[in-house]
Amino acid sequence: MIDIKLLREHPELFRELVRIRNSDINVDELINIDQQLREQQQKTEALQSELNNLSRQKMIEEAKQVKEQLAQQEPVLKELQDKRKQILDRVPNFLAPDTPVGESDAQNLEVFRWGEQPKFDFTPKTHEELGKKLGILDIERGAKVSGSGFYYWVGDGARLQNAAFRYVEDLLTERGFVPFKTPVVTKSDALYATGYFPFSQDETYCINNSDMVLIGTSEQSLVPYRMNETIEESSLPLLYTAFTPCFRYEAGAAGRATRGIFRVHQFHKQEQIVLCKPEESEYWNLVCQKNVEDIMQGLEIPYRVVLVCTGDMGAPGFKKYDTEGWFAGFGEYRETHSNSNLIDYQARRANIKFNGKSKGFVHTISSTALTDRALIAIIENNQTKEGYVKIPKVLQKYMGGQTEIRPAQHKDVERVDVSYLKDRLNGLQYESIGDGNPETLAFFKK
């Protein structure tokens, strides 16, 4: 949400903003509605003041008339308030001065690369092929149970995922981030507060007959954690991280790297969230980016960083970096992380303020730390000629020292003594279904 006072004082800035953002917002219509609303508010305030100041003699004679006028004002005010809010809610955020101008991700500006793309003396397999061969990724049964866009991590696949997210959470907590286990269901207000509503409603799983939704990122549960609060300035910054399942419709994603599990309806994500003072948001945006790159380097995934252009940035974003990992199966860089400075856009919608030597709305940073996509890159980039997958060194300690994923072998499970558990019933006095009915007892014994 933007500052309405700024709109009144500098409408030309907003006309230019919606032009650059390719937004369909009519700034002049918004200004006109705002002016009408303010005039009607003044009229209502004058009537209320008149009602309050009526003498006893005139009260009986005139109060009824003034109250009728006030009653007539209510629907007028509400209609104008609703119209203004409907437009205001869709006004995009300002943009950082160094944001590239462009229409799509093709115009994003590459700013850095790290790592060498793996070279193979064989044709590399895709993560779907490797996952099926190794028995670590089951897309077919995911579709059987839940439909397309769902999947199972199995065996060492599940262990690899656990290892990767444990590694990332350990790294972030060592750097001062507080870990959370958040709800995965929130009120729709939480998505409005974070700027996902009204822009991304078609991407959201809404629960029937309720005001509840499934989160598409823990940003939607972590930022509203401080909704309608005023934070002591001395407590800032607040550094939060959470690992959650995430749910997205991915409407209109056909043809956009939908092969395998790159673009799905449910995935897992570790998020970085920062609430800070306005003058520090650029710094924390860069800190989150450093964390992203340290994670990618630790996982040995070659990557590039791009500065996102105007046409590829969501409405709440002020400045955004995307990090794209190399995927040997795709043969190209693909997005694995997004890292956005949202300045005060979310805080105004969520009403998160700070107070101290200075006061105002906090700034927020939202950055991916890890998603399942990184596992795809690990599987595709670290494959061997035999079809095995080498485990990155930083993850080996989380997998009991295992260095490689090979096809799962059936293992006989050692039988343990459980007779003492059955023996607990001996000597207990109670009525069972077989008491007094030999036929029933004989049937159940079979």
Q: PLM ranges: what are they?
A:
Residues 1-118, 132, 136:
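N-terminal alpha-helical targeting/anchoring segments
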Residues 7, 33, 164, 387, ...:
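Conserved anionic group-binding/transfer micro-motifs
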Residues 14, 54, 84, 168, ...:
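Hydrophobic alpha-helical packing residues
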Residues 40, 87, 171, 295-299, ...:
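Short alpha-helical functional segments enriched in proximate histidine and acidic residues
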Residues 112-427:
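TRNA-recognition modules of translation machinery and tRNA-sensing kinases, especially anticodon-binding
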Residues 429-435:
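Short acidic, glycine/serine/threonine-rich helix-capping segments at coil-helix boundaries
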Residues 435-446:
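Amphipathic terminal alpha-helices
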